[in-house]
């Protein structure tokens, strides 16, 4: 009706008017949660199967986070959902619980497909699914590049209820007919903004074309740029929107500071001075390039500091053993690129250092959102050269937050 009215006034075709209206809708989509979203305060009242509830409590969850209270029920109902949610809010468990609830374990075919931007995140999702589904006998495979194709095919032939993976490898497996899509009921796009940043748009569309027409779609993203809204328009039917306003995206309980360093070389001395503070719990130090990670790691070790490091060029096996070491607490300081900033969950991390300020402001939330997960307290310290001040102010404004100069007693705050 609205489209016809617009068409009448402007002398446009109805189809064109509809598109204009849709574009108008898109500009406002970011700022509201759909009215029909109610809040379910406990896992017990979500109507979940008994064996899944056991898995949830065994995993250590007690009370659902805000996004879980709103989204799980809607996804289980079969609605298409757009959730704007950053890391550290329990978004992975949100769709893992929902996916597990919707499976028919008796049928050994792929019923849910989860796409993620990085191998690490896909593996993390697989781990969470297997842990939460521990009492359900769920089969779940991570389908990611850089691993043996033959092994992938063997696993898929065996029968997997859920496949989590990166778009390239998943599409490859569908094309080879190893991943059969006929029983798929649900597609989850995790960190959709990052998948688009990495140039996966074509592959996501390719995968989508192979899925049954009635497939339910859930999309999770920290930001909702235009391209994402375009995608939701194509893939989704009357989606429910569950959105966190941008100024809530800076996780509460994280104290943010900056240290002014006049020159790049001074960052290293500053870091050495802070080392004792770093090892109080566990810390992650972010650099913007792989080369910088390698350089800083070597320099720290030369100065007799114990650190471990990780970036995207390392072989999968090596990255996994480094992560395992860090998770177990055997290593306390990890130097990394942004490959780590997405979806990897180490609860003990309570200090983040941005040795380099991130290249874009969205990454800032992914990095520091890690340090106070699920309401835990955390501290973030940004090393800022003179020409970085502008970027820092931009980040402050974007997240309507305050980043103060680091006090002398920073160790007491951790």
From Swiss-Prot:
CDD domains: DEADc_EIF4AIII_DDX48 (cd18045), SF2_C_DEAD (cd18787). Residues 72-242 form the Helicase ATP-binding domain. A motif (DEAD box) lies at residues 190-193. GO terms for biological process: mRNA splicing, via spliceosome; mRNA transport; nuclear-transcribed mRNA catabolic process, nonsense-mediated decay; regulation of alternative mRNA splicing, via spliceosome; regulation of translation. GO terms for cellular component: catalytic step 2 spliceosome; cytoplasm; nuclear speck; nucleolus. The keyword Cytoplasm applies. Its EC number is 3.6.4.13. It is found in: Nucleus; Nucleus speckle; Cytoplasm. A motif (Q motif) lies at residues 41-69. PROSITE patterns: DEAD_ATP_HELICASE (PS00039), HELICASE_ATP_BIND_1 (PS51192), HELICASE_CTER (PS51194), Q_MOTIF (PS51195). ATP binds at residues 63, 68, 85-93, 345, 370-374. It is an enzyme of class 3 (hydrolase). Its main location: nucleus. It catalyses: ATP + H2O = ADP + phosphate + H(+). The keyword Cell inner membrane does not apply. Gene3D superfamilies: P-loop containing nucleotide triphosphate hydrolases (3.40.50.300). Keywords: ATP-binding, Cytoplasm, Helicase, Hydrolase, mRNA processing, mRNA splicing, mRNA transport, Nonsense-mediated mRNA decay, Nucleotide-binding, Nucleus, RNA-binding, Spliceosome, Translation regulation, Transport. Residues 253-414 form the Helicase C-terminal domain. GO terms for molecular function: ATP binding; ATP hydrolysis activity; mRNA binding; RNA helicase activity. Belongs to the DEAD box helicase family. Identified in the spliceosome C complex. Part of the mRNA splicing-dependent exon junction complex (EJC) complex; the core complex contains casc3, eif4a3, magoh and rbm8a. ATP-dependent RNA helicase. Involved in pre-mRNA splicing as component of the spliceosome. Core component of the splicing-dependent multiprotein exon junction complex (EJC) deposited at splice junctions on mRNAs. The EJC is a dynamic structure consisting of core proteins and several peripheral nuclear and cytoplasmic associated factors that join the complex only transiently either during EJC assembly or during subsequent mRNA metabolism. This is Eukaryotic initiation factor 4A-III-B.
């Amino acid at each position: 009706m609205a489209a016809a009215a617009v068409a009448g006034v402007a002398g446009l075709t109805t189809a064109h008017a509809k598109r204009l209206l849709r574009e108008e809708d898109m500009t406002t989509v970011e700022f509201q949660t759909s009215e029909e979203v109610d809040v379910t305060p406990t896992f017990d009242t979500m109507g979940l199967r008994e064996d899944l509830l056991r898995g949830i409590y065994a995993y250590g969850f007690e009370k659902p986070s805000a996004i879980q209270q709103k989204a799980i029920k809607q996804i289980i109902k079969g609605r298409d959902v757009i959730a704007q949610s950053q890391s550290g809010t329990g978004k992975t468990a949100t769709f893992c619980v929902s996916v597990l609830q919707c499976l028919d374990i008796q049928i050994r075919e792929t019923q849910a497909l989860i796409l993620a931007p990085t191998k690490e995140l896909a593996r993390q999702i697989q781990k969470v699914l297997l842990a939460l589904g521990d009492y359900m006998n769920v089969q779940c495979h991570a389908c990611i590049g850089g691993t043996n194709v033959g092994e992938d095919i063997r696993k898929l032939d065996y029968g997997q209820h859920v496949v989590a993976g990166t778009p390239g490898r998943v599409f490859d497996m569908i094309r080879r007919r190893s991943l059969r899509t006929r029983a798929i009921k649900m597609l989850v796009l995790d960190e959709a903004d990052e998948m688009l940043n990495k140039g996966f748009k074509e592959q996501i569309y390719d995968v989508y074309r192979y899925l049954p027409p009635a497939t339910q779609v859930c999309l999770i993203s920290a930001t909702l740029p235009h391209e994402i809204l375009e995608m939701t328009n194509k893939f989704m039917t009357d989606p429910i929107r569950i959105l966190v306003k941008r100024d809530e995206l800076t996780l509460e309980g994280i104290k943010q500071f900056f240290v002014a360093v006049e020159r790049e070389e001074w960052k290293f001395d500053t870091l050495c001075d802070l080392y004792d503070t770093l090892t109080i719990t566990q810390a992650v130090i972010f650099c913007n390039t792989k080369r910088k990670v390698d350089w800083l790691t070597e320099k720290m070790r030369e100065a007799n500091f114990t650190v471990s490091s990780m970036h995207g060029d390392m072989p999968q096996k090596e990255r996994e053993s480094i992560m395992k070491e860090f998770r177990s607490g055997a290593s306390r300081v990890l130097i990394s690129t942004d490959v780590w900033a997405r979806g990897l969950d180490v609860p003990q991390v309570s200090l983040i250092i941005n040795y380099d300020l991130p290249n874009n402001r969205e990454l800032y939330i992914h990095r520091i959102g890690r340090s106070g997960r699920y309401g835990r307290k955390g501290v973030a310290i940004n090393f800022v050269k003179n020409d970085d001040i502008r970027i820092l102010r931009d980040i402050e404004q974007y997240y309507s937050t305050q980043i103060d100069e680091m006090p002398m007693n920073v160790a007491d705050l951790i």
